């Protein structure tokens, strides 16, 4: 809606019914997949040590395979739509953080600034905290994170930038149809990267389901033996790399837990992008008023335009449900 002139998806639906129907169809397929394995639409409840408490039947997998294959055309058209949108001409290079080789859960992570050699290391919790700093700051309920004292970005754009050659053939093909090239340094391209990933992960789902159908079976989960220990992992969530760590006592009770979400890691980078974007908007408005009356900058950069561009940038990161809405109240202080 941001790029097509609508205030919301609901407003867009009557004007662009085909696009809206494709989006709803893709949402239905993702819901089917999550329900079949995780037990509900979001935040799976069936995961257990060593597997899942609910395993889809062969018949269910065959039905899912049909749904996934049928969704492929919708995903490709959606990616083409996002690749054709008129994104703001704004760039700010940062550090791009993802797992290596397009794995969802893996042993190596990549930090790439595309100005120097990419940094790759084993995804251990100890190494993560040697590299990442956490800081509590005034005026924010979220901690600020940095690599080497600098902000970084995680999520779809980081994954596509770092692992473009590991995309599925069709995902890579639809990406190359667009004028946007990867690595891309505009945060607005994150939404296009997400659309590319729709194609990639439908291809991944097809391969996984086809592999599972002939050998799916229900097996009892292994009996657990409790002991005092700490476990940690890095995995890719849709919004980026998730770090989680748990310390258990001798009875298997969680005594300490540490979770660092992708949105939390992106907060500092969002703020740096906003600062840079505002500087560009103000500079552009100032250039427009050159030689004109003093109040022309105010006319060429109205408050409504500022709010729209700021919200568009925040939504490009897809940080949460609430941030997908129109949320910003902007207070302007005029300096004479």
What are these regions (language model features)?
Residues 1-239, 261-289, 295-336:
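Active-site bordering "gate/hinge" segments
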Residues 249:
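Short, acidic, Ser/Thr-enriched surface-loop or helix-capping motifs
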């Amino acid at each position: 809606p941001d790029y097509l002139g609508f205030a919301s998806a609901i407003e867009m639906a009557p004007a662009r019914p085909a696009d809206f129907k494709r989006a709803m169809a893709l949402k239905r397929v993702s819901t089917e997949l999550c329900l079949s394995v995780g037990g509900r639409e979001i935040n799976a409840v069936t995961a257990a040590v060593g597997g899942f408490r609910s395993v889809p039947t062969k018949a269910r997998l065959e039905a899912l395979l049909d749904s996934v294959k049928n969704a492929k055309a919708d995903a490709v058209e959606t990616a083409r739509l996002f690749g054709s949108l008129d994104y703001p001409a704004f760039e700010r290079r940062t550090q791009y953080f993802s797992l290596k080789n397009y794995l969802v859960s893996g042993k190596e992570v990549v930090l790439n600034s595309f100005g120097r050699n990419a940094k790759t290391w084993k995804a251990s919790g100890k190494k993560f905290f040697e590299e990442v700093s956490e800081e509590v700051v005034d005026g924010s309920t979220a901690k600020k994170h940095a690599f080497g004292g600098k902000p970084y970005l995680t999520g779809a754009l980081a994954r596509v930038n770092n692992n473009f050659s590991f995309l599925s053939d069709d995902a890579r093909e639809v990406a190359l149809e667009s004028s946007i090239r990867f690595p891309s340094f505009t945060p607005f391209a994150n939404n296009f990267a997400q659309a590319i990933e729709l194609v990639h992960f439908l291809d991944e789902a097809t391969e996984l389901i086809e592999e599972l159908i002939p050998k799916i079976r229900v097996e009892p989960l292994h009996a657990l033996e409790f002991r005092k220990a700490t476990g940690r992992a890095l995995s890719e969530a849709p919004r980026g790399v998730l770090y989680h760590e748990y310390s258990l006592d001798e009875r298997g009770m969680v005594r300490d837990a540490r979770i660092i979400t992708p949105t939390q890691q992106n907060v500092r980078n969002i703020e740096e992008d906003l600062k840079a974007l505002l500087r560009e908007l103000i500079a552009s408005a100032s250039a427009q008023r050159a030689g004109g009356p003093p109040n022309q900058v105010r006319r060429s950069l109205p408050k409504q335009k500022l709010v729209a561009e700021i919200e568009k940038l925040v939504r490009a990161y897809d940080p949460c449900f609430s941030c997908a809405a129109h949320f910003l109240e902007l207070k302007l202080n005029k300096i004479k």
